């Protein structure tokens, strides 16, 4: 029998290996809202969390219980009370909160403990621990309204948490915490997840929502937001009366976490199977990241970037789209190159060759990774090269191309005669390639 060759699996694994190495030993805080726990895909999410643990990632899982608490209140005909969009937890509500949280604690612990069953890692033991790692205090009275047993974090026992994580345990935290006087308080899962991520200096905080992430006006996923942009989204939703959706609650915490040193916060769908793995082990992810600095950067190339540039341009050279460059030539001309990198992978490049006497420059070796050719990376490179040319005192920019004539024309370049090229460039013109010459004024 001939076995089926699964090339997609091979390619996917090759691309995921750098992320496996990067994530190993790092601390991730995962925030699971009650809505995610109720969804039919929750078992798959738990299995993926178990897989992350098996890869050496230190995990803190924080679960919420909002819909479960509301269901308990409804079943006992107890009206939920809110003040300024915060739940007022009276004595009766607290008992129902503890009931919901306790049930979820046992259920999630059991699921995590068996998450590696029916896998090659079956038999590997996952130790799940919970405890009084958080000390709570009451919210108190606001505008004459007593929040009763609704609370906030007073302090976190970071040392105890680190000891558990270093021992290889998954830490599971729920919405109920005790005070120094032994009273129980109801806390929000987003506050717990956010403060744990900050105090533990977590690499990532990950949250789940019903959609694939934050969307723009066209309904497309926004792959990256800075904290000020995320804050604006929160305020816009609050103006519409949305204070407690999973997306808003997570973004609120993500803004605070990023500004306090957590490098990346990820918002993904709890409805999509494998979303957690796709987000963490692929270059572009599948949801929305909130970051202090972009995962993507544009900069001048250095000698260390030669390997990445060669890997990017070789296929285009083999197709005859680009003129072939040897490694030695690239080493000598590396200072002329600008690259776009994403997660340390070169995804686009271009070079500027100035001709100072004629006050003209050539934009050459323009290449964009196939995965990003429908994006704006080409325009970004063109803008950067044009800016460099103007800073160098050049007044015109030209390109030689056999395939991208219309692309450059759409961006202000016009076809010109070969005679308008700088004299030294004209002498090197390859009449066999018959490249078109296009030129633009830099203004």
Curated annotation (Swiss-Prot):
GO terms under biological process: L-arginine biosynthetic process
UniProt entry tagged with the keyword Lipid biosynthesis:
no
Per UniProt, the enzyme's principal EC class comes to: transferase
Its keywords, alphabetically, are: Acyltransferase, Amino-acid biosynthesis, Arginine biosynthesis, Cytoplasm, Transferase
Q: What is its EC number?
A: 2.3.1.1
Report the leader peptide range: none
**Cross-referenced PROSITE patterns, in alphabetical order?**
GNAT
Molecular function (GO) terms for this protein are: L-glutamate N-acetyltransferase activity
Cellular component aspect of the GO annotation: cytoplasm
Q: What is its main location?
A: cytoplasm
Q: How does it assemble?
A: Homohexamer.
Record's protein name: Amino-acid acetyltransferase
What would be the name of the gene that encodes this protein?
argA
